[in-house]
């Protein structure tokens, strides 16, 4: 017997080539079955999702959950919209990543990956992102190597120049 049966939803599952009304049985955190007309008595709970789309978790590849006034807690901005995995794009830098991880990543149900801002302060405001002396390639590379389970790249943005110092520092960090 499954824990939950999603009954009558329109399943869209590109990996398995499904784009039609189907039922979805869930046991624990696993999909137990996807089929037409799964009997309701095979589930502890039944949710009528007729008129709704049912799809594997979506991925948000550009989100802000740290370092800006628009930043939101991952679960608040993701889960209500079917997003189960997100990429924070540079809210934290090498100096404040550990705080970001403790405050936002660890408590979240949403799976969070991040780009580490080349600026140690992260997206702490426009002036902070102009601080070339806070763009430390070595510290950025060390933090990425320390947390490769979460950190998947380097963010550089909002730099007014002159020149390409922010990009040069990010490339230096990436090459380490």
Predicted regions and their residues:
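Charge-patterned, long linear interaction tracts outside catalytic cores
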Residues: 163-176
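Di-metal (Zn2+ and/or Mg2+/Mn2+) metal-binding site signature of metallo-dependent hydrolases
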Residues: 52-75
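Fold-independent oxyanion-binding glycine-rich loops
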Residues: 8-9, 14-15, 34-35, 49-50, ...
């Amino acid at each position: 017997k499954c824990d939950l049966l999603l009954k009558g939803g329109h399943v869209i599952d590109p990996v398995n080539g499904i784009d039609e009304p189907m039922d979805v049985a869930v046991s624990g955190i696993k999909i137990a079955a996807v089929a037409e007309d799964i009997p309701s008595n095979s589930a502890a709970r039944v949710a009528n999702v007729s008129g709704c789309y049912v799809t594997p978790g979506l991925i948000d590849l550009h989100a802000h959950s740290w370092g800006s006034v628009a930043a939101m807690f991952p679960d608040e901005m993701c889960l209500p919209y079917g997003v189960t995995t997100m990429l924070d794009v540079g809210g934290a830098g090498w100096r404040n990543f550990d705080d970001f991880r403790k405050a936002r990543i660890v408590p979240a149900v949403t799976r969070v990956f991040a780009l580490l801002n080349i600026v140690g302060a992260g997206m702490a405001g426009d002036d902070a992102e102009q601080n070339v002396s806070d763009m430390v390639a070595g510290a950025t590379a060390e933090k990425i190597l320390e947390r490769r389970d979460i950190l998947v790249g380097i963010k550089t943005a909002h730099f007014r120049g002159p020149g390409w110092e922010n990009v040069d520092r990010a490339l230096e960090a990436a090459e380490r």
